[in-house]
Amino acid sequence: MPKMFERRVYLLALAALALVYFHNTIPHLTMMPRVNVDEPWLMERAYQVMRTGIPTQPMLGLKTAYLLQVGYGYLLAPWMAAFGVGLFQARLFNVLLGLGAVLLVSSIGRRTVSPTAGLAAAALLAMDSNFLGGARNARTDMPSVFFVAAALAAYVVGLQRERGWWFGLSGACLGLAMLVHGNAFWAGVILLAWYLLDYGVAGIVRPRGYNWLAAGWLATFGPYLAVVVARWQDVHVQIGNFAGDRVPAWRPSVILHQAALEIDRYRGWYFGLVTKSVPNPLLWTFRSLTAIGIVLLAVRIAIGPSRTAPDRNGAARLLILAAGAALIFAGFINNKVPVYMPHLLIGFALAGGFAVSEISALLPGFAWLGPAFVAFYAIAGVAYYEKWYSSAGKSELVPYESTDATLRLLAPSGPKYVYASPQFWTTFYGDADTDFLSYAEAQPVDGGGEHPVTLAGATSGRPIVLLVDELQWLPELAAGISQPTTSWQKDWVSFIESHCVLEAEALGTAHGTIAAYSCVLDGRPQPTSGVRIVGGATEFTVVRPVLSQTADDLARWTKYDDPRRPSTARPSVALTADGVRISGDGWPGILKMFDATPGDRYLVRTQDSMTHDGDLLYLGTWQQPQVRSLSGASSSGIPAPLIAQRWFPRERAFIADAPQVRMLVYSEAPSTDFVISSLDVLRLQPAPARTARAAVGR
């Protein structure tokens, strides 16, 4: 009876943690994190599997099967077939797999240490920002983590029940984990170490479970191996194109170099649901318990297992898992991004859970400390993420459904080619007369003389629309973040300047300004009478100017005195023949309180030059709600970069929420030197329905 009672309490506590996990993962699911470029790539491959059975990548011009990380597409395809194609559906799929990983980790903790250890490990995962970010993102990481956790849990069950098919299930899950993401090979090393721990070398000479493990792994991963061997040339090319820098090296010098860089991954541990470095007591607790748990595991190994331990090798098993995974990732996982942290968090959470269980067991009469910690930690997690939701809700982020409505206003209906950031694939995938291509797929090639431009994927028979967003494609064109040479950027910019006209601009989206260009391959399209202005799902027209500031007027604005400015800073604001020159360090700038009508919408235009990264027009303030974006977000203010590219829209817009709105022109750069010569504010109003597609004069 006591055991039955304990099991029911354990299951009730686990159900409560599952509810807490859903609280941390379901709200604002399509709003935060912002759509990652990997998500639509993976969704498109799954969509192609659903349609044709082959994981092709049309947006990147890949007409044959993408042969790397093929498992995710085949996992997601039936889910899409059942529930539809969309960002919410894809992210919900990973949320459920993340819950599965939490439950499996709890099972491992319960079967190797104690129910308290299992619940504490589950709580640490369910409250971790990095793990939650992976669960809320439609990437391959969380499905791989789920199958890794399943492989480890199945092994533990097979060991305790002495049933070979559990080992077979463990091997099959390992194969699935590796099909989804190649990084999961680390779990195979851990399982081998566990097997040697339990059976020794003799266990390989006299098979017990490893033959089942191998058979299960070959059942799921074997067919893929056969395809790799048969199509090695294609696989080799795709590795070179997409993952050449991520292949593990085997030279000791390279391994040591990679290990020295591993600290970069841990610096980004916080990144996930919480997307910026802010005080995070949950993370501090997790880190502390992990460190304490590693030490206590070593101590427990030295003094021997406790009398009540369900697994005599439990401490050694968890230490191998936590430390072994960390060592493998340090030396052999070259990409040091924090999105791979959930793999490591399996072992870290179990080490932390062991610490909670061990400490509560070592204190006579305080066995309640373990369950109390789990309850308190869960409540603290709910409160913390409620606060984060509130804070992030004041940012520029909006649900993707809002972005979808904006994109449909920007792009004309009918047959067309759309070149844009991969994030926008979800909007256009179902349009039969639209060919959506990632900007990275093509490079305009000037035919010279009378020959038209060649643009991969496009012909002169249909309109060409470019959707250049401020946060992804524009930085690529300005700085070449992912392209190895400047020719790609120069050719795209030249194409935009010579063969395109700006047809519409969406202001205040979750992706900054999105500019819609109408382009042709030969010559230049006819200029429009104006540019349409879009905010959210509404088009706007300019009514009249309400404020016009020349350089002389700007020179009379109040000089900005930033509270962070050190006494050694040398900010400068001076009126010159070209305008007001803002230079120096210490956040130099000028500000003015603009008299606004709450609820009205305004467009802000600046004339500036020599601007660089960090030079901003800040509308509103974070201290009090004064503005919102045209999409209804950014209630904590709109810190808008002063765009240097002349071919890209430079206006900003806002909805006034207060009778006075602060307008601040300044720089966050370590040092700056730019000129602003004028600033104009114009009132906007929704365009009448009959002229909703009419252009707005500039």
Can you say where each PLM-predicted feature lies in the sequence?
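Short periplasmic/luminal acceptor-recognition loop of GT-C membrane glycosyltransferases, typified by
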Residues: R408-P444, I464-W473
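Signature aromatic-anchored transmembrane alpha helix within multi-pass, membrane-resident enzymes
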Residues: L14, A18, L218, V356-E386
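Extracytosolic helix-loop segments that constitute the early lumenal/periplasmic catalytic or substrate-binding loops
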Residues: F22-H28, P40-Y74, P78, A249
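Hydrophobic/aromatic-rich transmembrane helices and adjacent perimembrane loops
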Residues: G134-A135, D141-S144, A177, W186, ...
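Transmembrane-helix motifs of polytopic, lipid-linked glycan transferases
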Residues: L92-T112, A150, A154
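Membrane-interface transmembrane helices that cradle and orient dolichyl/undecaprenyl
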Residues: R110-T112, T116, A151-F167, A177, ...
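Transmembrane-lumen/periplasm boundary regions of multi-pass, lipid-linked membrane glycan transferases
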Residues: L42, Q48, L176, G188-P305, ...
